[in-house]
Amino acid sequence: MQDLYMVDSIVSFGVEKLWKLLSQEYERFQGVEEQITELRDDLKMLMAFLSDADAKKQTRALARNCLEEIKEITYDAEDIIEIFLLKGSVNMRSLACFPGGRREIALQITSISKRISKVIQVMQNLGIKSDIMDGVDSHAQLERKRELRHTFSSESESNLVGLEKNVEKLVEELVGNDSSHGVSITGLGGLGKTTLARQIFDHDKVKSHFDGLAWVCVSQEFTRKDVWKTILGNLSPKYKDSDLPEDDIQKKLFQLLETKKALIVFDDLWKREDWYRIAPMFPERKAGWKVLLTSRNDAIHPHCVTFKPELLTHDECWKLLQRIAFSKQKTITGYIIDKEMVKMAKEMTKHCKRLPLAVKLLGGLLDAKHTLRQWKLISENIISHIVVGGTSSNENDSSSVNHVLSLSFEGLPGYLKHCLLYLASYPEDHEIEIERLSYVWAAEGITYPGNYEGATIRDVADLYIEELVKRNMVISERDALTSRFEKCQLHDLMREICLLKAKEENFLQIVTDPTSSSSVHSLASSRSRRLVVYNTSIFSGENDMKNSKLRSLLFIPVGYSRFSMGSNFIELPLLRVLDLDGAKFKGGKLPSSIGKLIHLKYLSLYQASVTYLPSSLRNLKSLLYLNLRINSGQLINVPNVFKEMLELRYLSLPWERSSLTKLELGNLLKLETLINFSTKDSSVTDLHRMTKLRTLQILISGEGLHMETLSSALSMLGHLEDLTVTPSENSVQFKHPKLIYRPMLPDVQHFPSHLTTISLVYCFLEEDPMPTLEKLLQLKVVSLWYNAYVGRRMVCTGGGFPPLHRLEIWGLDALEEWIVEEGSMPLLHTLHIVDCKKLKEIPDGLRFISSLKELAIRTNEKVFQKKVSKGGEDYYKMQHVPLIRYNWPQEPENNEVIYSFPSPII
């Protein structure tokens, strides 16, 4: 039986995407209109066969072959079309500028049409049926719009059904039992071990009991240095990006743990030998450090209390499934649950083997389907798998569980399948930055901001992540400050399923072992269009990669090692995505051949060792994302090439340039994120036209800057949400601050109305900034660092800062008195008061802020310390705060920490 809920395949999504490209750009195909029209008609006919072909691919090898050929045809056609459009944009009236001109392109398109006709003939001979369609993209577009209209529950989806009672018990074991080394949570994959550990880690009692907390995911192939470095960075943020030798890391960890109480979580340890490799970092238990382990295996740590979560009872399974699959009851007026659907759901739940992850995934799959017919198809598929596959009723048999996981993938719309397969390209337990991921998806054409009025690439990615979280396929939570999903992870079982699907679809190739058959030297013959490299040791400076069809190349070093790249990109002509984070280049020069990659839409050189960028970068006119936050410790030669990159949405510039020519950025009208915009290297007036900016980091220099001009520019940025103003490292304002800074902030009307985050560093304001800032009604984060204000008195008035969530006051050397009136900052959650040397007391008004959950205080002033300590005369003002940290965060090792973005405080 054809599985109607599975027809939105990866192949059909690719065909739809190509058809959409041809339709949207039709007017630009001058001279080849006839061939383009024929190709569109052929694609429409082809789409009609895909539903039946996809339904038969599991049992018919020839059907699978047809789908693979269609995928290759789609890729080849897209390459031809994009070359035409890119070359044609240089000279709209003439195609003589690229080989063969119109005639060659026409022949290539005709060849594609012939290949489509041939594969259609083969499918007809195989008995694959055609569906009548009104429009090639009608099904997928309607499905996508329906999915995105679906209302997502605002409740936490941690769904600790059956585990709630254990959280308090294990928290007490960690904070109340001084004799134990910690807790080891063991059991099957998908049992909820990590979910339980996270609930414990985030518990208020745990946060207030321990001086420091660290969380590290331990993959099957880990290095001890990387694990130790992650822990050290968690416990002492100043070492987060350091490159210390392993012995030094061990020594510093040993010293920290000798004197501080710390809880360290090791998530997903595989065997006891792994623990013994890591253990030398721990001193004998003096200060009270403890560990919390999760593992599929028992007896990982010989001295930990072992806790084994039980499988859910059948009643708990049903309760959990109801919470997810029937969530529409709460959100859709008049929604009625069919009794037959309830009966089927109960029966399907039995095949989840009482495993929480399987129940959640089944619930997410059912929740996305609205009709009895769709639910019957899912039920029949599960039952047929059990009958045909001979799945046993043994609860240790994972076959039916894996089938539920596989079904949850197959039930996704095609665009979400692409998204999920991309997530699988990252290493096990890897935390994926969603902002960067959103641009990778956009570069591959997965996201369609144009379909959603006013939406950005990041907005659409957030919608997609929300869908995957709702279906319990991705682990992520919205950030309390940004209301976005900032990072995400794949559950390891779901990742295993996705890797199998990626292999079936020839979606990507992962290189991990330099000695394997999948090494870099075999890439020229690879049919995969996407390559991910974990083991960067396979590269030497002489290696040049060759693959004429490769679209995406990601380097994700496991650990912190750098790698050398070759000098030639010419053999990778069709790349859309190139991630070179941490790469080293001969002589510090990025090869000029980078300019040959005219299809490139995503380029990252974050932390790369580069001192010279070639002028050929100007050829990369299709770039959406360009990250040049290079870590060379030297001045960087940055040519004036950005003015031609009109599609840019994200631009991160180096900290310091060696070039004297100003960068012209005024043409970048589509920019949404601009980092390290220097008033020395660029004209502030360029900002006037960047009206779509949402995030802006400005490096202030005193050379010719008029602050009125800057204020005027900022007032034009109506969509700006996140603003950081920081002095350039070599700026003259350190000697003569008044050459740059005005004594007060501009009036409220000069600030962007949507501003949610503002960070001021070394601004030397003489007038209290709070009366202005508290009137910015969208502000959620305010950071005043290092003499941002140099006055004696600061006042937060009642009713001010209505949505403020986080306030950081760091290094205001002159501040003596701070008044917080009752009713000010009613939603404040986190407050940091750090190194304000003359501050006499904490504000009395803090006792009225019932929302305050975290207070960090660091000072060397003995009198102040005594006042705020437990039992001190000021303690009553803060005793209602669940988590109070003293002498935290630690002092940055040097001023470089100040300039991290968006915040130096972890």
Curated annotation (Swiss-Prot):
Record CDD domains: RX-CC_like (cd14798)
Biological process according to GO: defense response to other organism
Domain of life: Eukaryota
SUPFAM superfamilies associated with the record: L domain-like, P-loop containing nucleoside triphosphate hydrolases
First and last residues of every LRR repeat: 572-597, 599-619, 620-644, 825-850
Keyword Endoplasmic reticulum: no
Regions annotated as coiled coil: 20-59
Keywords of this entry: ATP-binding, Coiled coil, Leucine-rich repeat, Nucleotide-binding, Plant defense, Repeat
GO molecular function: ADP binding; ATP binding
Record's keyword annotation contains Transmembrane: no
Annotated NB-ARC domain residues: 138-452
Binding site for ATP: G187, L188, G189, G190, L191, G192, K193, T194
Protein task: Potential disease resistance protein.
Assigned protein family: Belongs to the disease resistance NB-LRR family.
Domain notes from UniProt: The LRR repeats probably act as specificity determinant of pathogen recognition.
Protein name: Putative disease resistance protein At1g59780
